């Protein structure tokens, strides 16, 4: 999305006065929309950290899980608007995590992006069994991922870094 009206910059313009009194801080907090809660389920620690940093830079609030059981616990405790789910995990599959969460009534208002280094037809077909989910093959470009997320959440302010 190239519209500047729906975006926020990562850094304030050089002319911005960063000093504010408590009244200004209260007013500015009221104007800032809540951050998009994102679950990142990825067993590769380096990729998970990169995704976490990118999502923070984009203005989202990511929570990372490296195992399916960690993700299930997080899904029970809090709501997410977006879940990026690796399919191949050491303790289960991303499909099983999502199916279990949906069976418990979790993830009802969550957009799901499955990703895997194995983009076989079987994997894509399995991902399509979850209504509204998207399959993204690894490796992927971060800018393409951001573009996809902007399409999923057109009204969310995002960072164009």
What are these regions (language model features)?
Residues 42:
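Conserved acidic carboxylate
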Residues 67, 93-96:
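Acidic catalytic/metal-coordinating carboxylates
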Residues 1-39, 141-161:
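Non-catalytic signal-transmission and effector/linker regions of two-component phosphorelay proteins
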Residues 64-82:
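Acidic, metal-coordinating helix/loop segments flanking the phosphotransfer/catalytic sites
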Residues 95-108:
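Short amphipathic alpha-helix used as the core "switch/output" element in two-component signaling
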């Amino acid at each position: 999305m190239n519209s500047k009206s729906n975006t926020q910059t990562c850094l304030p313009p050089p002319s911005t006065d960063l000093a504010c009194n408590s009244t200004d801080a209260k007013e500015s907090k009221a104007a800032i929309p809540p951050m998009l809660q994102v679950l990142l389920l990825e067993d590769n620690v380096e990729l998970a950290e990169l995704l976490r940093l990118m999502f923070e830079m984009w203005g989202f609030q990511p929570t990372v899980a490296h195992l399916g059981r960690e993700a299930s616990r997080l899904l029970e405790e809090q709501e997410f608007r977006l879940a990026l789910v690796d399919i191949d995990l050491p303790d289960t599959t991303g499909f099983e995590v999502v199916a279990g969460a949906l069976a418990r009534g979790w993830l009802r208002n969550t957009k799901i992006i499955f990703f895997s280094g194995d983009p076989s037809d079987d994997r894509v077909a399995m991902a399509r069994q979850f209504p509204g989910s998207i399959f993204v093959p690894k490796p992927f470009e971060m800018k393409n991922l951001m573009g996809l997320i902007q399409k999923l959440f057109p009204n969310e302010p995002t960072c164009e870094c």
